[in-house]
From Swiss-Prot:
Organism per entry: Bacillus cereus (strain ATCC 14579 / DSM 31 / CCUG 7414 / JCM 2152 / NBRC 15305 / NCIMB 9373 / NCTC 2599 / NRRL B-3711)
Protein family per UniProt: Belongs to the UPF0337 (CsbD) family.
UniProt signal peptide: none
Name of protein: UPF0337 protein BC_3635
Top-level division of the source organism's lineage: Bacteria
UniProt xrefs under Pfam families: CsbD (PF05532)
Transmembrane regions: none
Amino acid sequence: MTKHDHGLKEKVEGTIDKVKGEVKEVVGKVTDNKKLQAEGKWDKVKGTAKDTVGNVKEKVHEYKEHKKEK
């Protein structure tokens, strides 16, 4: 992705981390593996954070574009 992705990279990475975390958490529960469950929860938190960063970058870009139009 380019430097002009306006948060898309973070959103994609965030979604991947959230899905990966969900899978780890479910597998951890099924196998009674507390460590894997914790890793899954952590991955979901990281994914949410990355997604938020992506959203902020997108909003900043939109704001800058709006200011250019004026």
